[in-house]
From Swiss-Prot:
Residues 32-53, 79-175 are annotated as: Disordered. Interacts with Atg9; the interaction is transient. It is found in: Endoplasmic reticulum membrane. One of its GO terms (molecular function) is protein-macromolecule adaptor activity. It comes from Drosophila melanogaster. Residues 87-96 have a biased composition (Acidic residues). Its main location: endoplasmic reticulum. It holds the Pfam family DDRGK. One of its GO terms (biological process) is protein ufmylation. Disruption phenotype: RNAi-mediated knockdown in adult neuronal tissue results in reduced adult lifespan and progressive locomoter defects due to neurodegeneration. Neuronal cells in these adults display defects in autophagy. Keywords: Coiled coil, Endoplasmic reticulum, Membrane, Neurodegeneration, Transmembrane, Transmembrane helix, Ubl conjugation pathway. The gene is Ddrgk1. This is DDRGK domain-containing protein 1. The lineage of its organism: Eukaryota, Metazoa, Ecdysozoa, Arthropoda, Hexapoda.
Length: 309
């Protein structure tokens, strides 16, 4: 009894298992057909889950960008177009499109663009800093050049001022030297010459000079040769004495081309100046005619008049 029950249970379980197996096989057959049928417009490699060559190369480039330092980035970027061209050739053999690129690859591409933008920004800042340094150096060079030119101009001005001061000093010394020489000449002119008076004391020389001046004032018009004979001097010595006396203001007058000295007193000169000032513009003929009335040329002493004639 027990054996029959066990056999019946075993047969029932076997029937159930066979039935479930047949049902499962029946349901799995349509799905297998659908999966086995190739998808139109989708590459076979994508249907099989194998990554495309272009995607593999792109992933490799992204990993290279992350591992290579910033300096060789530019060199690596130059080699990328060649790999890109081969990728496009491989993609031409595949009938797929970029719409089915995995999401991870897109994220890697975006990360590379951000890093590239960051590196470009750093490069831009570096170039800007170099430009600022260059401008600063140029400005320093320009300022140094301007400072050197300014200093050179100041040196030139100082040198010119020094030369001007030296020239004024030399001119003053020369003027003083000439004045001293003229004084010595005037002093020597009144010394007794070999053919003149015998050497006397200082009082005699002063008296002789006073007589010389008074003689000219009394005679008004004197012949230089006669004056030299009267005082036992040479004619050139007489001329030198008269010029020295004119220079210091003791005598006023003119030496004409006939060898005569015409003495004109300061009072007579003032009268002539007053006449010219009153008349305004005066011709030489009018001045000569009026001078006969303004200037008295008559000798004071008769003896002096005979000598002058």
């Amino acid at each position: 009894m027990d054996l029959i029950i066990l056999v019946g249970i075993a047969v029932a379980l076997l029937v159930v298992i066979v039935t479930l197996y047949l049902l499962q096989k029946k349901n799995a057959a349509p799905e297998t057909k659908v999966a086995a049928a190739p998808q139109r417009g989708v590459p076979q490699r994508a249907q099989e889950g194998v990554p495309r060559r272009a995607q593999i190369a792109r992933n490799q480039r992204n990993r290279l960008r992350q591992n290579v330092p910033a300096a060789p980035v530019a060199a690596a970027a130059g080699a990328l177009p060649a790999a890109g061209d081969s990728d496009h050739e491989d993609e031409g053999q595949v009938d797929g499109d970029e719409a089915r690129v995995p999401q991870g690859a897109v994220l890697d591409e975006k990360m590379g663009a951000k890093k590239r933008a960051k590196m470009e920004a750093k490069e831009q800042k570096r170039l800007q800093r170099e430009q600022e340094l260059h401008d600063r150096e140029q400005r320093k060079v320009k300022e140094a050049k301007e400072e050197a030119e300014r200093k050179q101009q100041e040196d030139l001005e100082a040198e010119a001022e020094r030369k001007r001061v030296d020239a004024e000093r030399l001119a003053k010394e020369e003027r003083e030297r000439k004045e001293h020489e003229e004084y010595l000449k005037m002093k020597a002119a009144f010394s007794v010459e070999e053919e003149g008076f015998e050497e006397g004391d200082a009082d005699d020389q002063d008296n002789l000079l006073a007589d010389f001046i008074q003689y000219i004032r009394d005679n008004k018009v004197v012949v230089l040769e006669d004056l030299a004979v009267a005082f036992k001097l040479k004619t050139q010595q007489v001329i030198d004495r008269i010029q020295n006396l004119q220079a210091d203001g003791t005598l006023t007058g003119v030496i004409d081309d006939r060898g005569k000295f015409i003495y004109v007193s300061e009072k007579e000169l003032l009268a002539v100046a007053k006449f010219i000032k009153q008349r305004g513009r005066v011709s030489i003929a009018e001045l000569a005619e009026s001078s006969n009335n303004l200037i008295n040329l008559t000798p004071i002493s008769a003896g002096g008049g005979e000598a002058s004639s």
